[in-house]
Amino acid sequence: MKEKVILAYSGGLDTTAIIPWLKETYNYDVVCVCADCGQEEELDGLEQRALSCGAAKLYIEDITDEFCDNYIVPCVQAHAVYENKYLLGTSMARPLIAKRLVEIARKEGAVAICHGATGKGNDQIRFELTIKALAPDIKIIAPWRDSNWKLQSREDEIEYCRQHGIHLPFSTDCSYSRDRNIWHISHEGLELEDPANEPNYKHLLVLGCTPEEAPDEPEYVTMTFEKGVPKSVNGKAMKVSDIIRELNRLGAKHGIGIIDIVENRVVGMKSRGVYETPGGTILYEAHQQLEELVLDRDTTTFKMDVGNKFAQVVYEGKWETPLREALQAFVEKTQEYVTGEVKFRLYKGNIIKAGTTSPYSLYNESIASFKTGDMYDHHDADGFINLFGLSLKVRAMKKLENEKKNNK
């Protein structure tokens, strides 16, 4: 009986060509695994395609809810944003996909796991760090770094498939390189490879429209959260995945969540991409609006640093690490009172606050009001400012003393 390899399979050109290559190069039985993270129509016809290319079996694993509940929600709660823009759509998904690859490898008794990530990108790191953390005994095959892989271009892969009698049921024309799941869709390549070029949004966008093309009338949306977890949209209770789908629909309609970023990859190079994250952008903003109301200042400022570190850890593929677990434990503690309702309106790419309420609100109108109130005496500020500015006063006094000495 042949040994088995588990292939992370998308059905695209790369992983289609990898199936016969694995059989020829390693004499393995190829078990394909497609992880459904909410990419929907991209899964149509996948099983037939994999088997016709020589795969022994195909698993289509629906991990959408696990992705939303256990990966997206912690990142939203941490307000993890990489380099102030990227909402980690691909970064969050890869560790979960790798985890499922390991689980199926154990089930099938496979000796190796293969992925089609290139040697220039971040995904190779995200896949392999997770596999190493969960299954250090399993061999990892990365064709684009394998000396036996002779296919150096898209044209080479197309010709290789033709020679092996593989029909490619999709366009082989040069197009954007895309990654899609329930959270986002990313676009790279073509005119985006030159940062001097403006994106061709009419050709590029898949989920939504530009702000200029959005409706001329705003749309009001209300969300509720319980302990930092989204629970409803416009009065309708839903599980997290359905909330994201509904926010995607609303956000895409109003031109929300389109970013053009030049980011620093883990491997050292810069890359340029356009991301569509309509629902995610709304969810991050709504959650942050509620936190503004219920978190104290010290927690808020420290949490900003934690969020930046959380984003870096996730971006670098370090999900299965003690540091990510520790950061998440802190974040979860901060979410105890992040419960309430957030109202906002969507208008031409903008999310405009329209009111926030919480039973745990730390906003006290009788203190904050410009009107005179019993709970705050303006004279109390005298002593506070004297103490708060004491170090500045001492420094200034010393400076004057030294200047007088020098002028004598």
Swiss-Prot record:
Pathway membership, UniProt: Amino-acid biosynthesis; L-arginine biosynthesis; L-arginine from L-ornithine and carbamoyl phosphate: step 2/3
Source species of the chain: Lachnospira eligens (strain ATCC 27750 / DSM 3376 / VPI C15-48 / C15-B4) (Eubacterium eligens)
Subcellular location, record wording: Cytoplasm
GO MF entries: argininosuccinate synthase activity; ATP binding
Main location: cytoplasm
Binding site residues for L-aspartate: T118, N122, D123
SUPFAM superfamilies (alphabetical): Adenine nucleotide alpha hydrolases-like, Argininosuccinate synthetase, C-terminal domain
The protein's assembly and partners: Homotetramer.
EC number: 6.3.4.5
Known catalytic reactions: L-citrulline + L-aspartate + ATP = 2-(N(omega)-L-arginino)succinate + AMP + diphosphate + H(+)
Protein name as annotated: Argininosuccinate synthase
Keyword annotations from UniProtKB, A to Z: Amino-acid biosynthesis, Arginine biosynthesis, ATP-binding, Cytoplasm, Ligase, Nucleotide-binding
NCBIfam families in the record: argG, PRK00509.1
GO cellular component: cytoplasm
Keyword check for S-adenosyl-L-methionine: no
InterPro entries per record: Arginosuc_syn_C, Arginosuc_syn_N, Arginosuc_synth, Arginosuc_synth_CS, Arginosuc_synth_type_1_subfam, AS_cat/multimer_dom_body, Rossmann-like_a/b/a_fold
Entry binding sites for L-citrulline: Y86, S91, N122, R126, S177, S186, E263, Y275
